[in-house]
């Protein structure tokens, strides 16, 4: 059985940077919101935003929670983030 890596979303790093900027957070502030246990170093945010490192699924879920958006909005290159974000937990099941 051959395993293929899934393609990285082309707009992911831009969207991650956009979330931080729209919410008006520094990298350190964002780390505290993403990882309250403080195991993540703030330099990791820069690596995500520059596309040098791909965030884990748990980190992407935390970004979505902090921004108040659905995970699909982050990883779907056909979806643009709104210019204003709720910045709180939003959960409404999506119909497919």
Q: Can you say where each PLM-predicted feature lies in the sequence?
A:
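DNA major-groove recognition helix of helix-turn-helix/homeodomain DNA-binding modules
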Residues: 52, 56-73
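Recognition helix of helix-turn-helix/homeodomain-like DNA-binding domains
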Residues: 35-53
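Short alpha-helical elements of helix-turn-helix
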Residues: 14, 28, 42-43, 57-60
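A short, Lys/Arg-rich alpha-helix, primarily the initiator
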Residues: 1-23
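Residue-level recognition of specific faces of alpha-helices
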Residues: 15, 44-47, 73
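Short alpha-helical "recognition helix" segments of helix-turn-helix
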Residues: 30-34
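Short, charged recognition helix plus adjacent turn
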Residues: 1-6, 65, 75-96
